[in-house]
Amino acid sequence: GLNSAQVLKPGSPLSHQDKIKTGKNGFIALMYLDDKTVVKMLGNSDLTIMGDRSGNKINKSLDIKYGRIAANVKPQKGKEFRISTPTSVASVKGTEFAIQSDPSSGDSFTLIEGLIEVTNSVTGESTQVQEGETAISTPDGSLDVAETTSDDLDGFEEASMEPPTQELRFEVEDENGNIKEILIKFN
């Protein structure tokens, strides 16, 4: 929403068309509050987030200039979640995946769970990518799908690490003298 660059702090709200960049050792986790879809940006990444309201639904998209992104997209139930890069466009239904995008060499889309459709923007060729597969889309127009190897996920280890959850528990007494336990979980 702001016109000038600023450092994001945990819990910072983001708006339609906000641009986000991470530095060399940067890491950011974003969450769409309507459906709890999580997007994780690793170091040296640049993207623009978009969320277009259509009635009571939000059509989401990420415009990735370059970088490494991991996401867990919840089933969209009549909404759309699109990812675009300089080389490709992907339509996501509800899935967990990792993307590595470089404008000069192209994109890799690695599916951990679910299904996406990837289209090479140069040729318009499309293919479906399933769990355990990686699609490679290049600026010369090629689009290939192969079985995922450990190399395809190299560098994404930090994206899969969930922060440890802390818990606070305390008891309160309501107006009728009943004891209730309150549990607060936080990272």
Task: For each feature predicted by the language model, list its residue ranges.
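A short, solvent-exposed beta-strand micro-motif common in secreted/extracellular proteins
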Residues: 18-24
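Contiguous beta-sheet cores, especially beta-hairpins with glycine/small-residue-rich turns
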Residues: 27, 31-76, 93
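N-terminal "first-domain core" detector
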Residues: 2-4, 16
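Glycine- and small/acidic-residue-enriched microsegments that form turns, hinges, and capping elements
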Residues: 24-27, 66-69, 77, 87, ...
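Extended, compositionally simple hydrophobic/Ser/Thr-rich segments
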Residues: 71-73, 81-82, 90, 99
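C-terminal interaction modules
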Residues: 4-10, 23, 29-38, 42, ...
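Short conserved beta-strand and strand-loop elements enriched in small hydrophobics
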Residues: 30, 81-84
